[in-house]
Amino acid sequence: MWELLVFLLFAVAYFLWPKAKCPGAKYPKSLPSLPLVGSLLFLPRSGHPHKNFFKLQKKYGPIYSFRLGTKTTVMVGDHQLAKEVLVKKGKEFSGRPHVVTLDILSDNQKGIAFADHGASWQMHRKLALATFALFKDGDQRLEKIICREISLLCDNLAMQDGQSIDLYLPLFLAVTNIICLICFNSSFKNGDPALKIIQNYNEGILKTLGKDNLVDIFPVLKIFPNKTLEKMKNYVKNRDELLREILEKHKENFSNDSITNMLDVLIQARMNSDNNGAASDQDSKLLSDKHILTTIGDIFGAGVETTTSVVRWTVAFLLHHPQLYKKLQEEIDQNIGFSRTPTMSDRNQLILLEATIREVLRIRPVAPTLIPHKAIMDSSIGEFAVDKGTNVIINLWALHHNEKEWYRPDQFMPERFLDPTRSQLISPSLSYLPFGAGPRSCLGESLARQEVFLFMAWLLQRFDLEVPDDGQLPHLEGNPTVVFLIAPFKVKVKVRQAWREAQAEGST
């Protein structure tokens, strides 16, 4: 009995003790590390993780490492090193780590966002990009879809003229419908039960992922009861049940002659692989219902809360800077007026608005730390060796708040993106990657940029958004989960008198 116990202890120690690194190789500086727990006891336990990692950078340098349990993670906070990881050696660092909570969310790394590098990820990313190509022209043009939903949003807000409201739900509905039209060619109305399901599981998943989950560091803990994991499983179950119902209806009505949305593209790809026989058997397995559902879930997860969050952050900063709000309205009045609504063709004229959006994406990046990458082979970052299987995290917050790259980085200054004459947009620093870069970059970047620009241009043209009568300004600290969320806040919505008069004049 004792011999067996000693053997088991030695076996555990062997597998959990840090393995010897390549002799002679130079590795990044590391936080102190203990057997079994790694650097866990030496990492700050309070505050925002991205800020804590940024502070550690001042002690350990722009690239350093730490261990969580048995896994080594390299933290990168320099734009040149970040681009080496994401672009120059993008394929070498294109993997995703296995994490218990993310494996639940992605059904063991299916889909796009959390899938490891391989045939499945490549196929689904390619098909998602093919879907966006469907929306380049005609009535299905992406801009038309976005503007239709923004028009409905503005009508909704106009009915609440003079009231103080939280913009989250109206924005969530509009952005969700844009994604729904891309994915299913359908949309929801306010109060639709399905919309409530999406909202609930979306918020639940973000809250769950935002918690410190020890089970992600010590996977063996998943054998014990875990409320967080049970909640995550329930949210994913609700998501998949809703999406499966939509998928089944889509299969019934599918026509190979009418490919108009992402589900059509995915179903068509599976049918083509089924018809090609044994040669495409592997492709068919990678296009199972579970794979399709996870990919659609990824598009929702990446496309809804992110855009909604950026628009809300932009409004929040403008409430703190009312003079800038007026300047933005003046820019729109001078270049567009009130006889028509803003379009993407106005983007080159509305340079102050574009500079403001860029500054919001800098000072409050959608994801302060990018989704972790994983080295799929032995590689290097700068002068440092990185072993296969090492996790690599890009601290986007560090890139966007580096005092050597940005003047007064903690201050909201849209003018930093304008030349001295305030007549042209500029790139003041290369340390700016709001959507990542390389093969793992955000595939919805173009959609997100269009959405944020058009949402803000329409809102500025039609409404005065003001601080509520109680004088409560939005808190700008935020809550970092997978997405950097702003705390709920209210804004007083007032239809602009100039807009009202122009509409009355146009109707006579």
Swiss-Prot record:
Annotated GO molecular function terms are: heme binding; iron ion binding; lyase activity; steroid 17-alpha-monooxygenase activity
Any one of the GO CC terms: endoplasmic reticulum membrane
EC code: 1.14.14.19, 1.14.14.32
Can you state which reaction this protein catalyses? a C21-steroid + reduced [NADPH--hemoprotein reductase] + O2 = a 17alpha-hydroxy-C21-steroid + oxidized [NADPH--hemoprotein reductase] + H2O + H(+); progesterone + reduced [NADPH--hemoprotein reductase] + O2 = 17alpha-hydroxyprogesterone + oxidized [NADPH--hemoprotein reductase] + H2O + H(+); pregnenolone + reduced [NADPH--hemoprotein reductase] + O2 = 17alpha-hydroxypregnenolone + oxidized [NADPH--hemoprotein reductase] + H2O + H(+); 17alpha-hydroxyprogesterone + reduced [NADPH--hemoprotein reductase] + O2 = androst-4-ene-3,17-dione + acetate + oxidized [NADPH--hemoprotein reductase] + H2O + 2 H(+)
Pfam families in the cross-refs: p450
Keywords, comma-separated and alphabetical: Endoplasmic reticulum, Heme, Iron, Lipid metabolism, Lyase, Membrane, Metal-binding, Microsome, Monooxygenase, Oxidoreductase, Steroidogenesis
Signal sequence extent: none
Q: Required cofactors, per record?
A: heme
The keyword Iron appears for this protein: yes
Q: Which GO terms describe its biological process?
A: glucocorticoid biosynthetic process; hormone biosynthetic process; progesterone metabolic process; steroid metabolic process
EC primary class? oxidoreductase
Q: In which pathway does it act?
A: Steroid hormone biosynthesis; Steroid biosynthesis; glucocorticoid biosynthesis
Q: Where does substrate bind?
A: 202
Q: What does the activity regulation annotation say? A: Regulated predominantly by intracellular cAMP levels. The 17,20-lyase activity is stimulated by cytochrome b5, which acts as an allosteric effector increasing the Vmax of the lyase activity.
Q: Binding positions for heme?
A: 442
Quote the subcellular location field of this record.
Endoplasmic reticulum membrane; Microsome membrane
The record, for InterPro entries, names: Cyt_P450, Cyt_P450_CS, Cyt_P450_E_grp-I, Cyt_P450_sf
Q: Which CDD domains match?
A: CYP17A1
The task this protein performs is described as:
A cytochrome P450 monooxygenase involved in corticoid and androgen biosynthesis. Catalyzes 17-alpha hydroxylation of C21 steroids, which is common for both pathways. A second oxidative step, required only for androgen synthesis, involves an acyl-carbon cleavage. The 17-alpha hydroxy intermediates, as part of adrenal glucocorticoids biosynthesis pathway, are precursors of cortisol.
**Record family assignment:** Belongs to the cytochrome P450 family.
Q: What is this protein called?
A: Steroid 17-alpha-hydroxylase/17,20 lyase
Source species: Felis catus
Gene from which this protein is expressed: CYP17A1
